[in-house]
Structure formats: C-alpha cells, structure tokens
C-alpha cells in the first residue's frame, strides 16, 4: 500500500487487488471510490450518505487475462462480437478492459477527486491493427464524471465501437424503473427483433430479467429504485445508444463470475456506440457520461 496523494480534503492510495492487479482507493469527505488499474476500470463509487452506486461481483476474477465483473468495464474498440469475427475468436467487447493502465495525474480538491489514466498500444488484434491511445478522466464527488478519449495514432483511418458498461446497484431489478426507455425504439437481442417505442406493460416492467436490448436514444436516463427510494440519473455525450442488460437467473447460474443471486442486485445501463464509428488517422474522439444520485427519503434512513 502506498499513499499517492494526501491533503486536508482526502487521500488516494494504491493497493493490491490480488497478486496480479493493483487499484486506487479514494477517500474524500464527499465520496469513497475504487479504480482498478487493470482495465482502467471503475469498481465502486459511494457518495456520502448514499448506498454504493456500482455493483461488483463477489466472484470477480482479479487476474490478468480475465475480465472483472462489475463496476464500469470499458468495451472498446468493438462492442459484443466484432462484425468480422464470425466465430468470435477474439471474444466480446474488445481489448481495452484487459490492459494495464497508468496513472497520469491525481487532483484531490474540495469538491472531490479527479484521476487521469492512460493506455497506449499498437496492433493489438488482427481485427484492429492500429496504433492507439486511450485516456480517461474520472471525477468522484457528489456526482461522477467519466470522459474516455480515443486517439488514432496510426496513418490509416480506423473504425471503433464501444460502451461505458455501467453495472448499477439496485434493490432488485423489478424495483428499477426507467420510464424514458419507453420512448425509444430498440433491438431485442433475445428475440432478434426490432421494436418501435413500446409503452411499459407495468410501471416496473423495465428491470425484469432476462433482458438484453439496444435502445436507440442518447436522452438522459433516470433509474428510479422504489425500494431504496433513490434515483440514478445518467447523462451521456457522443453516444447513440443505451444498452440495457441483465442476464436473469438461468444464464447467471452458468456464469462463474456472478455470485449466487448476484443478478438480483444490478441492472446494466450502458452509454454506447454499438455500431462501428469512424476514427480518422491522427484524430481523437470522446465518449462521456455523468451520473448523479438523489435520495427521496430522510438521510437518517438512507443506509438502512
């Protein structure tokens, strides 16, 4: 354990997640958080007087070469199966979440903690044979901000897809309502069909699993948790879709990195560009999100 920054407002320490992996532990008067340097992956964020916002599986494998289940994995430079990988030999969601990121800067101030991370690579895959650099600026305070900047360092244009794959902690999926989703058309990955905007069958229909949908919207989304009496608002910049996912009991039981009944503790709402987007040679693009939590019950009861 080593203290990287410490002042009157808070501190940031670097600790071991396992023999293989390291993480940053953030402590501040407004918030607590944890970030894995493997994958540049946010693992937790808990504003003061609130419950944990992000879900992390107790069975997550903190090992090189294995994805961490929970927090905000980075899906990049493709989402799901690469369109040119018919046999899925390269796996889902690209290679960014399996790389070791470096800490470029940490700023601990009165409002919160800002962490800047980066990773750079070249010819990481036959499906993506380009030089590239990724940077993240993460702000943890009473709200959370994430800005991912993608730079094409090669001499050729490239195409990317990606998502900020947020696992949101909820009292139960059936208690999570996202009414804005009813206004958007979507592709249902379970049925293989596309649907026009579809009114909710019941007020709590959104979170009932299994669900795997790509909603064609970049509107602000608000997750209302009726039991925990809080809202989680997500705003996004430079994305075209929201991906809504929960595996449900049957699939989760066959996923070793989801602890028993873990699927009953989260929903995924992912700011995404699921289709390939142009990233010109020598140019940069960004994807970003802001998450805000608001309770609508007395503070004395918020951690009950």
Which residues does each PLM region occupy?
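Beta-strand-rich N-terminal accessory domains
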Residues: 1-69, 219-239, 283-300
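Extended, loop-rich substrate-binding clefts of extracytoplasmic carbohydrate-active enzymes
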Residues: 3, 13-14, 90-140
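Short, hydrophobic/aromatic beta-strand segments
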Residues: 44-46, 156-163
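Beta-strand/loop-rich accessory regions of lumenal/periplasmic or secreted enzymes
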Residues: 66-94, 182-192, 221
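Acidic/His-leaning functional-site neighborhoods
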Residues: 98-99, 106, 204-277, 281
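Hydrophobic core residues within well-ordered beta-strands of beta-rich domains
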Residues: 134, 144-146, 285
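Asparagine-centered strand-capping/turn motif at beta-strand->loop junctions
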Residues: 149-154, 293
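Active-site/ligand-binding surface loops and adjacent short beta/alpha elements
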Residues: 157-159, 167-241
């Amino acid at each position: 354990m080593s203290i990287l920054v410490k002042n009157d407002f808070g501190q940031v320490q670097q600790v071991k997640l396992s023999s293989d992996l390291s993480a940053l532990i953030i402590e501040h008067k407004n918030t607590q958080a944890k970030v894995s340097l493997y994958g540049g992956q946010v693992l937790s964020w808990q504003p003061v007087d609130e419950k944990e916002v992000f879900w992390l599986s107790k069975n997550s494998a903190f090992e090189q070469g294995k994805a961490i289940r929970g927090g905000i994995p980075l899906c990049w430079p493709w989402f799901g199966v690469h369109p040119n990988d018919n046999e899925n030999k390269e796996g889902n969601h690209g290679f960014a979440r399996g790389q070791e990121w470096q800490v470029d800067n940490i700023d601990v101030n009165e409002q919160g903690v800002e962490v800047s991370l980066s990773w750079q690579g070249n010819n990481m895959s036959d499906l993506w044979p380009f030089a590239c650099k990724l940077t993240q600026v993460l702000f943890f305070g009473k709200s959370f901000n994430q800005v991912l900047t993608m730079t094409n360092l090669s001499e050729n244009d490239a195409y990317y897809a990606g998502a900020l794959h947020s696992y949101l902690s909820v009292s139960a999926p059936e208690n999570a309502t996202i009414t804005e989703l009813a206004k958007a058309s979507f592709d249902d990955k379970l049925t293989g069909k596309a649907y026009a905007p579809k009114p909710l069958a019941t007020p709590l229909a959104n979170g009932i699993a299994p669900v795997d949908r790509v909603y064609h919207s970049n509107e602000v989304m608000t997750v209302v948790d009726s039991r925990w009496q809080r809202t989680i608002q997500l705003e996004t910049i430079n994305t075209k879709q929201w991906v809504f996912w929960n595996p449900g009991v049957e699939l989760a039981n066959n996923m070793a990195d989801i602890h028993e009944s873990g699927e009953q503790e989260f929903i995924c709402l992912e700011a995404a560009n699921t289709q390939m987007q142009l990233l010109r040679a020598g140019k940069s693009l960004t994807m970003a999100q802001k998450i805000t939590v608001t309770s609508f019950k007395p503070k004395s009861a918020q951690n009950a």
